[in-house]
Amino acid sequence: MDSKFSFLLIVLTLTLGSCKTQNVDTSAINLVKNKLPEFSWDKMPLYMHLRKSTSFSNKEIQYLSKFPLITFEKTTGSKTFGSTEKGTIKAAKAVKKINPNAKILYYKNVVINWGGYSEDENFLYEHPEALLINAKGQKSVMPNGKTGFFDISEDYVRKYWLHHVKKVTENPFIDGVFLDANIKVLVPGFFNSRVGEEKQEAIKSGYLSMMADLDSQLGDDNLLIANILRVRPEFEDSGRAYLKFFDGSYIEGFEHESFGMAYEDYLAQGIEAVQKSAREGKVIAMSLGIGKGLKNAEAGIDDVRKKVSKHEDFSKRLEYLLAIFLVCAEKYSYVYPHDGYGTEKSAVWLKTFPQYEKPLGKPLGFAKREGYIYTRKFEHVDVWLDIKNKTSKLNYK
């Protein structure tokens, strides 16, 4: 771990010394030899999760450099630099020039063969049989009808996946991995309907083995964040048992009604799971959609929402989402109220809001709950949240 950060310091010093587009004081660089992100209660602790297939402008990099924790999604930089791997590293390097303490995660799906990864393409060219097939001998696909899956029940496929992730994270500008589609693997319904129960169990077993290997091989030096906590009937305690492999959880699909549960009951159960995990010191990257939730073909797995207009007043909605976050948050909890992750169509990209800049202060205790009403006091704000009526108040002192 020390060697990784030492190398980063050397590279940054040399790079910054020759940088013509950014005016940065290299003497001020102070790399934190800790895989956890920087955290402060001074203001709202924010997370960033995004994708852009072309290169980022200087303005965009300056904006990104303000976030302590960033995930660059699939396709990042792939059109400009030829692959997601190269595009992510280029973007990470640019951010690190300005803020070397920002923690940057490389997105890698645990099973879905998303396009744009050059190493995946090369591997599948040599091993086309590594893709999952159904009982008819046809490629098993996502709801889009074309994107396939890696057959992670096979040992050689898992070894390739681990080698790929290890190679990218060895780059000094990458601090860890964001792991997606865990829930698709763990709940029986998704793969049962595609490849049958026996194969689904083999995929799940392969996944558990792969995550254990990931933790043992990369966990000491790299931040491992998984899209894992979720209220589902198949999970005990909302999937918290799987956090043993990871440093924390990304949160989505958090705030709607599902599986016959009322909105407020589903959300209350999710809040409880996040509170428990955050209090145990797990990193929480809470992603909350500003737009109205839409039904999805894989209900309860993917969070799909209506876009919001750039001219729309969503201040009340934003305050409500921040109140949800604040009744859950502990040290190493971060929030991203968003309008989708693609920068081209997002109404909140490059924007900030007054609630992000107002003083927050340390919490003066855990949140208190009475029925569906939560309250919590911070040094500079009192939070009141009613999840049954979907209302909130942030009373700044």
Predicted features along the sequence, with ranges:
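Sec-dependent N-terminal signal peptides
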Residues: 6-14
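Glycan-processing catalytic domains of CAZymes
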Residues: 24-397
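Positively charged n-region of N-terminal signal peptides that target proteins for export
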Residues: 1-5
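C-terminal motif of bacterial Sec signal peptides marking the signal peptidase cleavage site
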Residues: 17-18
